């Protein structure tokens, strides 16, 4: 039996969650351990592959072959500075096969194996698919998968590929804060008044801010911003560094960082202490025989934790200012500020946001861990033709987070689609040659907000050749950008005189484009 609808999957940096709409209600599905969220962890041993809780539970014994944080690698290049700095915190080995794409190498069943970030993510997606199948008692073929709103084209495409590898037809990629807004909007009900809602989504690895208006079932995103590399993991890292130094001080300079197992046990204790500090003002860490048989005990206060992560917490406010600016909205016009993501439980984060909005009461009505999967599942139901009184008339109008354009003479970034444009969208512009009798043009596609392409992100390039000889500026070359509802880009170019055309879909292999 095949389930004829689609499931909604929140593929998170640290935890993932799956939901399904059936019988007029939405269910967030518990996994085989009874947990409604599943760690985004995959482990390889001499005999098997483990995914989820089973993988995370054995991480201290098997740190080199337990992979997590694939979302911090997906769609990025190996020599990206972010990847290079993350590698310092990871016990597993990340290398590249010379094409600047990162691969993770592990020992599996006694031999060395390498996996791409998409393959690791596909294993987590597979686990979520199986969790849903066990619950539904049917095979699942389709899913809506969420990504951070600030994910770029490569990261979106790579996430879609991960779904395909997991045997899922990804009906749509949707933005996490927008999915959370659906959960919020459905939960709140409709009073017929337009509301301006700001979603503040701080998770395990990523941060998004989205400003939207909700009016009679229409969810219209006005602006989005964020940091694809900020979240709970970064706060854990600060604690790990702090306690590593503390251990050195108490034990004649012994450095526990030389042991991956010790570091992992410390990290697990730090994650626990961080959670404790959201409800208590101090937390104690106790680990027996942490390193060279030395027991470790230490206490940290909430105030100290806030000091260690102060710059990170404060950095969440700038994207909030940016979305208001982009949407040309005054902060006093925001009706609801909705918190999403586990890291929004941190009291300091809450007080910073509340203070920014003049002491406003924040909205905590939706479950910060489940809202994204909830919204994704509602969208999955609608996109597969589901009809319900509760969801009828629901329409999502999302935007593209980054400006898209091409390079023109002198390395100038010429924008075709500006950031925060509603998607799907299609824009064309006429360009010409800059030399007499120029036989072809080399079209380079970029995304980013800077004036020069060298400061933007190259998505890909292609050539349009066979232009008949003509003086410079005479040939008419129409370049068209077509951005679909997933936020994935197709670019085509046509020489008007001859009707010659060429096009590309920006694929996950950056710079190596699939010619249609």
From Swiss-Prot:
One of its GO terms (molecular function) is ATP-dependent protein folding chaperone. Keywords: ATP-binding, Nucleotide-binding, Stress response. SUPFAM superfamilies: Actin-like ATPase domain (SSF53067), Heat shock protein 70kD (HSP70), peptide-binding domain (SSF100920). PROSITE patterns: HSP70_1, HSP70_2, HSP70_3. It comes from the Eukaryota. Signal peptide: none annotated. Belongs to the heat shock protein 70 family. This is Heat shock 70 kDa protein. It comes from Leishmania major.
